[in-house]
Design a protein with these regions (language model features):
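Glycine-rich phosphate/diphosphate-binding loop of Rossmann-like nucleotide-binding domains
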Residues: 4-45
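Glycine/charged-rich beta-loop-alpha catalytic/anionic-binding loops adjacent to active sites
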Residues: 7-8, 34-38, 85, 109-119
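Short glycine/serine/threonine-rich phosphate/pyrophosphate-binding segments
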Residues: 18-23, 46-50, 71-78, 97-101, ...
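N-terminal beta-loop-helix "entrance" segment that forms/cooperates
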Residues: 38-59
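Glycine-rich phosphate-binding loop
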Residues: 53-92
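Short, glycine-/small-residue-rich phosphate/pyrophosphate-handling segment
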Residues: 96-146
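Glycine-rich phosphate/pyrophosphate-binding loop and the adjoining helix
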Residues: 129, 137-167
Length: 167
């Protein structure tokens, strides 16, 4: 686990079963040179730890928190209630869930004044959460802005190459 000081992004998930999906998020962040803090903290089973983590995040150098959970996915909202840092929510599917719809609604339906930027359910949402975190950080970081521009150009190039290969 990376030290909880001086890294700008934390990736927090409600269960170790979420790690498989969130690995894509972690790898996407690392591709931009960001080694995130990775934690397993449950909004329901470890609420005090969740509150303390969020309350101390800014003083520990964290600038953005990515929170992933399935089922009654309250993790992102519970963290958002305890900090003014941007929270990016990633709803996940679960074996006991409703295809991720339950987690999506739990993550996106926040009361006024407690915002959570909610991504798509699952792997696409995990990767987009990383990219969105980089976009937030790039507002004040010229190096990240360049890496982000290079990333977008590489995506464009891949699509153009695939298009030219279609019969």
């Amino acid at each position: 686990m990376v030290s909880e000081k001086n890294t700008p992004v934390a990736v927090v998930m409600g269960s170790d079963s979420d790690l498989d999906v969130m690995r894509g998020c972690i790898e996407q962040l690392e591709s931009f040179g960001i080694k995130p803090i990775v934690r397993i903290i449950s909004a329901h089973r470890t609420p005090k730890i969740a509150a303390e983590f969020a309350q101390n995040a800014a003083e520990n150098g964290i600038q953005v928190i990515i929170a992933a959970a399935g089922m009654a996915a309250h993790l992102a909202g519970a963290l958002a209630a305890q900090t003014s840092l941007p929270i990016i929510g990633v709803p996940l599917t679960s074996s006991a869930g409703l295809g991720g719809v339950d987690a999506l609604l739990s993550t996106v339906q926040m009361p006024p004044g407690v915002p959570v930027a909610t991504m798509a359910v699952g792997k696409a949402g995990a990767k987009n959460a990383a990219i969105f975190a980089v976009q937030i950080l790039a507002l004040a970081d010229e190096n990240l802005r360049k890496k982000l521009a290079d990333f977008k150009k590489a995506q464009e190039k891949k699509v153009i190459e695939k298009d030219s290969g279609v019969l």
